[in-house]
């Protein structure tokens, strides 16, 4: 019997363009595959041993004859390629209507309402890379005290502010105001606080980022598990993505290594249910910034710690390594990419070497976890428990 599942999200680690990638401008994207090509290979011996290289052809990540885990990949049903859409589908909510995006910036009524409520003008109001817009408007922001507001191809309203110009408490208050405005007809999936420090030409975003999400529109695996009396521990930005819904305990992290440390800390504790971890650095530090070398190094750094994670699993534990979308750092632009996600499963009770194939929905993961923990499911997805457990 399995009584604890670790759902371990390697944020943006896609494994090849989906068949509908043309509708998203993402034909040819392949986060893992293209990083390994551009960087002449990638060393992920521990994920390789579990079966990662048996899913797809990745330079330096070879298939193994006897994988220690079960493996496969999944397509996405939802209409999107963003954090919220991906994570919601992973826990059983399929998003058929895409969230609003603002390729021309936010409309005048939104701008006026926001500026009136915060008592300041805003800078920017356009789609932009977060680091590029700091180079462009950071100095003016420091001179005027006006927050920098921008969006992307995702459904986001992002507010950047220097921590010495607009204090964190005030920045978070601005985000709460924006969250109330960006509902209904103007609903965005997330309002994001993007604090930074430093001087013009050398700005650095800090780990004090905060996400303000919409409430999920239906019950997720997390809600069902919580109602069934299970522990649901959110590590990283998980609490923010679900606006706290379905979470019994949450811890925010400063980087990938902290995320792994916290996951291990909770594995050592007495809890039963779900440990839901997100490692965001792949996406935020390397994917959007189109830095394949940094992305590769971050993946290798994570892989080196996998034996440590696995050593803390007990006989009733199961871990699923997966992702929420792609963000190919070799691809055009600076946005997410519409890709398959890898699925690698390990546990003392998991059948080694099983290929679960190509799943039709990320929600198959939710259905499987519901099945394993013997709780109700969301009605979406198809469980693959029978293939992976003795």
Swiss-Prot record:
CDD domains documented for this protein: PPM
Subcellular compartments: Cytoplasm
GO cellular-component term (any): cytosol
Pfam families, sorted: Metalloenzyme (PF01676)
Reaction equations catalysed: 2-deoxy-alpha-D-ribose 1-phosphate = 2-deoxy-D-ribose 5-phosphate; alpha-D-ribose 1-phosphate = D-ribose 5-phosphate
Pathway per the UniProt entry: Carbohydrate degradation; 2-deoxy-D-ribose 1-phosphate degradation; D-glyceraldehyde 3-phosphate and acetaldehyde from 2-deoxy-alpha-D-ribose 1-phosphate: step 1/2
Binding site for Mn(2+) 2: 283, 288, 336
Named cofactor requirement(s): Mn(2+)
Main location: cytoplasm
GO MF term list: magnesium ion binding; manganese ion binding; phosphopentomutase activity
Keywords: Cytoplasm, Isomerase, Manganese, Metal-binding
GO BP terms in the entry: 2-deoxyribose 1-phosphate catabolic process; 5-phosphoribose 1-diphosphate biosynthetic process; metabolic compound salvage; nucleotide metabolic process
Residues that, per the record, bind Mn(2+) 1: 11, 324-325
Record InterPro entries: Alkaline_phosphatase_core_sf, DeoB, Metalloenzyme, Phosphopentomutase_DeoB_cap_sf
SUPFAM superfamilies documented for this protein: Alkaline phosphatase-like, DeoB insert domain-like
Enzyme Commission identifier(s): 5.4.2.7
Cofactor note: Binds 2 manganese ions.
Family of this protein: Belongs to the phosphopentomutase family.
Function: Isomerase that catalyzes the conversion of deoxy-ribose 1-phosphate (dRib-1-P) and ribose 1-phosphate (Rib-1-P) to deoxy-ribose 5-phosphate (dRib-5-P) and ribose 5-phosphate (Rib-5-P), respectively.
NCBIfam families in UniProt: deoB (TIGR01696), PRK05362.1 (NF003766)
Protein name: Phosphopentomutase
Lineage: Bacteria, Bacillati, Bacillota, Clostridia, Peptostreptococcales
Underlying gene: deoB
